[in-house]
């Protein structure tokens, strides 16, 4: 509530503690942090790693994220997506103009013109790849706190345009 009125001498009602996190969804690495006491701390994985590599592999045995996915960069690069943040908010035609060599094949048949990377799991949009990374960070935070996240702030680079920010 914006304004709470109470009787003089009465204790204010105890506010419910909510669990919020900050997420840096990076091009190369990502991480999640929260306030612990009066200090902001990054939340490590079960292996003690603060950083999660922003790599997703779509394999026969499921989806792998981070270090597990990195091992497939050479073995299966057509199904291992790295630096997906560069593709967020871009149209299929904009990606063709990049000039970068990308090992992926793109699905140009989507009705909205958005790009999708063709993987063995089907056509995957960049936002879906980002969601896989965010899902791992969310689980990491919820395992840390033993409760569900009530809110999150996700960073975006200053140079992102509106389309990229919305995705």
Model-inferred region functions:
Residues 1-53, 58-167:
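N-terminal phosphate-binding loop and flanking beta/alpha elements of the actin-like ATPase fold
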């Amino acid at each position: 509530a914006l304004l709470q009125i109470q009787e003089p001498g009465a204790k204010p009602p105890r506010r419910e503690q909510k669990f919020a996190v900050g997420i840096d969804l990076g091009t190369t690495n990502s991480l999640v942090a929260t306030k612990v006491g009066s200090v902001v701390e990054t939340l490590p994985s079960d292996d003690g790693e603060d950083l999660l590599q922003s790599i997703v592999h779509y394999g026969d045995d499921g989806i792998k994220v981070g270090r597990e996915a990195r091992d497939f960069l050479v073995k299966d690069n057509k199904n291992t997506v790295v630096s997906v943040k560069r593709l967020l908010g871009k149209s299929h035609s904009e990606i063709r103009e990049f000039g970068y060599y990308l090992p992926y094949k793109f699905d140009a048949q989507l009705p909205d013109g958005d790009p999708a990377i063709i993987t063995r799991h089907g056509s995957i949009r960049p936002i879906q790849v980002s969601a896989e990374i965010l899902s791992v960070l969310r689980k990491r935070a919820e395992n840390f706190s033993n409760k569900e996240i009530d809110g999150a702030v996700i960073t975006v680079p200053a140079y992102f345009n509106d389309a990229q920010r919305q995705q």
